[in-house]
Amino acid sequence: MPRKARIDAPGALHHVIIRGIEGRKIFRSDDDRMNFVDRLSELIPKTKTDCFAWSLLDNHAHFLFRTGSVPVAVLMSRLLTGYAGWFNRRYRRHGQLFQNRYKSILCQEDPYLKELVRYIHLNPLRARLVKTLEELDAYPWCGHGVLMSESTCAWQNVEYVYGLFSDY
């Protein structure tokens, strides 16, 4: 039976989630995470996608994207296919790395967007990868530190997110 087509349009907001097959790790080391981030830094501008939030955990990752003229499916296909091939060669393994297709949830601008930015960026804290907000500020595999000006990330759109929270 064919899969349902994903709904996408220029300017659509997507909460994208990728998971390792059978709950396995998709990132075993910081080198793995760096390779993935390097791929994002190349593909985000190329596909004219905005990334407002992101978080890499051991066995899954979350992103908040606004599509440009290129569908999110193109970005995700290039990202996940390239990374899975690299990962499989690196660890001398075969087969699927990711559980099914990535999950993509269309989001409304208000009021869900602010909560989603919080949810995605607090994931490492909930997963106990960091213990405090100060540690989260310095956690390099999440967009939170970029928003807190503790690190930089050229492909993360911080100005838009700052605008969402400007009334606080």
Model-identified regions with their sequence ranges:
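Short Pro-Cys-Gly-centered "Cys-loop" motif that presents a nucleophilic cysteine in a tight turn
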Residues: 1-58, 66-168
